Amino acid sequence: AHIKTESCYRLRLLLTQRRNLKRKVLDLENTIRHSLKAFGIRIKGTGRTGFDKAVREAVAGDALTSELMDAMLTARAALWKEYGRLHDLVVKMVAKSELCRRFMAIPGVGPVTALSFMTAIDDPTRFRRSRDVAAYFGLTSRRWQSGTSIDVQGRISKAGDADVRRSLYEAASGLMTRFKGKDKVKTWGQQIAKRSCHRKAVVAVARK
C-alpha cells in the first residue's frame, strides 16, 4: 500500500476536518428542523444565510423554545465560522500549489476537488495509465465472469476514496449542467448522455 508523505497527510487532515465541521453544521440544522416540526413549524427554502432569522421568527412567541433555539443557533454559528476558517485555509493552500491551479483551470473543478485529487494521488508515478487512476477512485465498472465465461460489466465499483470520487462526480456534474462555455469534454459527455443517460455521462466525464 502507498504511504503518503507527511505534507500530503497534513493537507488530507485539513480536508477531512473541514468536511467534518460542515457535516456537524448540517446535523445541527436538521436537528433544529426536526425539533420544530413537533410544533407544526417547517423551516424550508431559507438558504444558509436566512436559516437563523427564519428559526428565530418562528419561535418568537415562545420564551422557552426561543432560548433553546438561541443556544442551538449560537452553536451552529460558531461551527459555521470555524468551517469557513478551514475552507479559507484550503483555498490558501490551493493558491500555493501550481498543480492545483492547473486542475482548477478545468471547468467545474474548484479548490476542494483540486486539493482532494492532488493529495489522494500524492505520487502520480505509481499509476501507469489514466484508467488506473479512475479505477483507484472506483469510477470504473465492476467486471465479473458469468457462468458462460462471458466478461460482464456492471455499475462502477465505488472502490477507494469516497470523498474524492464524490468531488470528481460533482465537478463533472457542474461541467455538464452549469458551465455555459464550450468544452471538448462537455461535448463528449453530452454525446454519451444522448446514447445512454445523464448519470453515466457524468461518471464518464469524471473519469476524464
Outline where the language-model segments fall.
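A detector of single, family-specific signature residues
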Residues: 1-208
